């Protein structure tokens, strides 16, 4: 793990959280219980405070940053997809930000909302609870259905379970030179196949 103090502020990481060794946490960063921080994530608390609350996940290649005197917050059980950028915003409890989305300064994503992949949420946007947001700029297109929220929660549970799996078995190694016979497949802990 790459942890850096900045002007006397040291990242705080709950002992039950998992932070991938290639992730970088700088300065005023607070990571809660059971959080998953993926490979190559950058949480740069050298201006504003970054808070990742319990049970949330920040996936591979995500960036969190914010201006001075602001808090960038991912609420409890928040789900931040691969490559997303969060800058000076608040992601509500149990909300999902899709892959490669950008959420700008002062934006608030409501609880249990879903931001579709590749969306751009403008600075100052004020979302409501359980909205499906999409587009560039993003706008609310409808409410999140019960099935969609259930699917989101299953996916978040996969990452919460992955925390323990990583603590138990993830370690650096050398590659094999060829695939072994009867190579096993990894199994998740829930069925997250989207319904059609």
Curated annotation (Swiss-Prot):
UniProt feature, compositional bias: Polar residues: 187-196
Region (Disordered), start-end ranges: 173-196
Any Pfam family hit: Hexapep
InterPro entries assigned to the protein according to its UniProt record, in alphabetical order: CaiE (IPR023446), Hexapep (IPR001451), Transf_Hexapept/Carb_Anhydrase (IPR050484), Trimer_LpxA-like_sf (IPR011004)
Record has Transferase as a keyword: yes
GO molecular function: transferase activity
Gene3D superfamilies per UniProt: Hexapeptide repeat proteins
Transmembrane segments: none
This protein's pathway: Amine and polyamine metabolism; carnitine metabolism
SUPFAM superfamilies (alphabetical): Trimeric LpxA-like enzymes
A GO biological-process term: carnitine metabolic process
Domain of life: Bacteria
UniProt keyword terms in alphabetical order: Repeat, Transferase
CDD domains: LbH_paaY_like (cd04745)
Function: Overproduction of CaiE stimulates the activity of CaiB and CaiD.
Family classification: Belongs to the transferase hexapeptide repeat family.
Name the record gives this protein: Carnitine operon protein CaiE
Species this protein is from: Escherichia coli O127:H6 (strain E2348/69 / EPEC)
């Amino acid at each position: 793990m790459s942890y850096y103090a900045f002007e006397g502020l040291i990242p705080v990481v709950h002992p039950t959280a998992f932070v991938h060794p290639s992730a970088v946490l700088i300065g005023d960063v607070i990571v809660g219980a059971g959080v998953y921080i993926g490979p190559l994530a950058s949480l740069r608390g050298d201006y504003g405070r970054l808070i990742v609350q319990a049970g949330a996940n920040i996936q591979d290649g995500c960036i969190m940053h914010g201006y001075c005197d602001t808090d960038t917050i991912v609420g409890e059980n928040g789900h931040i997809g691969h490559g997303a950028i969060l800058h000076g915003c608040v992601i509500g409890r149990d909300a999902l930000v899709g892959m490669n989305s950008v959420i700008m300064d002062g934006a608030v994503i409501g609880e249990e909302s879903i931001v579709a992949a590749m969306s751009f949420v403008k600075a100052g946007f004020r979302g409501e609870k359980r909205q499906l947001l999409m587009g560039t700029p993003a706008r609310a297109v409808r409410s999140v259905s019960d099935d969609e929220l259930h699917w989101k929660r299953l996916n978040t549970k996969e990452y919460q379970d992955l925390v323990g799996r990583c603590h138990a078995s993830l370690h650096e190694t050398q590659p094999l030179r060829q695939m072994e016979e009867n190579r096993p497949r990894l199994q998740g802990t829930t069925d997250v196949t989207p319904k059609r």
